[in-house]
């Protein structure tokens, strides 16, 4: 299964192509908050560099926050447009849950993982997830 991942909740946009759980190609933006100008060219580059096309994609996953409100709107709108044009299913992914999933690889069962993101203005976005069967399954 090919998954096109789109992340625009932070200062830098990124796009990845994952096949059967393995990252095939990824690109990270180098210009702060330039998601609108760079996101679709990043998608094109990831597909081209991997030798893939939109016809190969089975699922589009887009980060739905928390994070930059404008970044989320750009990412979700772009992912939905791709989905509607191509008929590829699109799913929203929590930024915090994806961070917890990253940490779950090395965490013991029943470990509480608390991912946090800078919300600016001396605030944070945070969440708590217990790990079960190697996955963050319970939000606290």
Predicted features along the sequence, with ranges:
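N-terminal beta-alpha supersecondary unit
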Residues: 1-64
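Glycine-rich nucleotide phosphate-binding loop and flanking beta-alpha elements
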Residues: 12, 68, 123
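Surface "functional belts" at beta-alpha junctions
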Residues: 22, 89-140
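Short, well-ordered alpha-helices that flank and scaffold nucleotide-derived cofactor binding pockets
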Residues: 41, 80, 84, 101, ...
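Phosphate-handling active-site elements
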Residues: 48-55, 84-93, 108
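DPxDG-like acidic metal-binding loop motif
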Residues: 61-90, 95
């Amino acid at each position: 299964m090919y998954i096109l991942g789109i992340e625009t909740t932070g200062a830098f946009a990124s796009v990845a192509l994952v096949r059967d759980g393995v990252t095939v190609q990824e690109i990270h933006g180098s210009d702060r908050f330039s998601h609108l100008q760079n996101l679709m060219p990043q998608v094109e580059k990831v597909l081209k560099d991997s030798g893939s096309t939109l016809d190969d994609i089975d699922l589009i996953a887009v980060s739905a926050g928390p994070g930059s409100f404008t970044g989320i709107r750009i990412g979700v709108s772009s992912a939905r447009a791709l989905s509607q044009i191509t008929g590829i299913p699109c799913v929203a992914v929590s930024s915090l849950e994806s961070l917890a999933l990253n940490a779950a690889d090395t965490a013991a069962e029943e470990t509480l993982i608390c991912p946090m993101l800078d919300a600016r203005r001396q605030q944070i976005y945070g969440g708590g997830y217990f790990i079960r069967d190697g996955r963050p399954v319970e939000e606290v």
